[in-house]
Amino acid sequence: MGRLGKAGTEKGVVMSRCSVRVLCAVLVSCVFGGPPAGAATEQVVYSFLGGSDGAHPSSSPINVVGTLYGTTSLGGANASGTVFSVTPAGVETVLHAFTGGSDGSYPWSSLIHLGGKLYGTAAGGGANGSGVVFAMSKAGAETVVYSFTGAGDGIEPLGRLIAVGGTLYGTTYAGGGYSCYDNDGCGTVFSVTPEGAETVLYAFKGGIDGAEPYGRLTYANGTFYGTTDFGGTHGDRGTVFAVTQTGPENLVHSFKGGRDGNNTEAGLIDVGGTLFGTTLYGGGSGCEGGGCGTVFSITPDGKERVVYVFKGGNDGAVPIAGLIELHGTLFGTTYEGGAGNAGTVFSLTPAGVEKVIHSFGGGSDGAGPVGLINVDGMLYGATNAGGGSGCYGGGCGTVFSVNP
């Protein structure tokens, strides 16, 4: 599956599925400035070199008082990932280089700012080699909030944390006590307090309830909504699920494959009470017969609609990241496809009209974009590769801006 093993063994970072996560550069446009009128649509903010500065940013940095904070899944002094900051001028500083020991390793998820601290997850490392939830000061002092045991509490926290009422909520890709695929478990939904008290809200069984949740949760009207990469009623094609703070899980939708799409690793967004998301594959017969992915909408009571089917050509393929909404239009990225076959930034109307805003060339502008965020009308994001000749010639990733 291309994910991390229990002990945090990296299994292919630059790929079109499980090993990339979103880097969305959250910047303030009035500070950053944005591209001038008439300039190229896309601009590179920072290119990772793959050494001590980190490699393959895999999640969404956040803006805290004009400074960008984020993670790289690899690189750093110990080749186990970093927490970094970047100024609007593109000056990068490594705040913490993970050792791969008790402090964690391979931080896929983005950070969250809560109570003056940064919180995040690392998929590997920790006291039991099963990942950690960590806290960090903006000066770089890291503490482990919770170290997963590798048993019923979960293994490999990959999705971003969210905060509700001062408590953190997230998912683990494996663990939970039920046998699934490689016997590591099928994943969990959990809560953890800043003081380190962890509670499993739901442990996936790997059947119709779903298996291996990857993306971040969305909270709406007292319920958490999320997706699983596998499981469901149609042969491991993934699900949309709902779970309350007290734990009961409800299957909202089971992907069928074909036009309906299959396998999703992105979180959902709530737009006026309707949830929107992406599937990696399905939708048609392109992309070697497996389909090139879809954008879908779904109501909390399970009414699903395919908004757009990617064809795998200039329109893009494999939308691995989630969506954002701006003035009634959806924006997102595809990891592959486009004119340069290195991914795209696209817009999509609710009626299903898609427009490619930028096609990545795979060189200095990056390759494999993995997510966007809107800041005052400007889009910021990152590519998992490209930007230079490091990381075995494929580039170590970039932070970029796009004027929609």
Where do the protein language model's features map onto the residues?
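Extracellular beta-propeller repeat domains
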Residues: 2-404
